């Protein structure tokens, strides 16, 4: 294999690697957005659960009805 062929082969590999790196970066960016969205949803669910839990806590603290 001549030097020119080796250089062409390396340039070709480098071009494919650049494409692969860009594709991987695109996937990573998409996953990061999805992760951030899921974190926001999780925080909202935790807040809602805490609010619901505090509602149930108030029921337990109330005195029983007079017929008990």
Curated annotation (Swiss-Prot):
Superkingdom of the organism of origin: Bacteria
UniProt-listed Pfam families: SlyX
Family the UniProt entry places it in: Belongs to the SlyX family.
Alphabetical list of HAMAP family matching this protein: SlyX
Protein name stated in the entry: Protein SlyX homolog
Gene: slyX
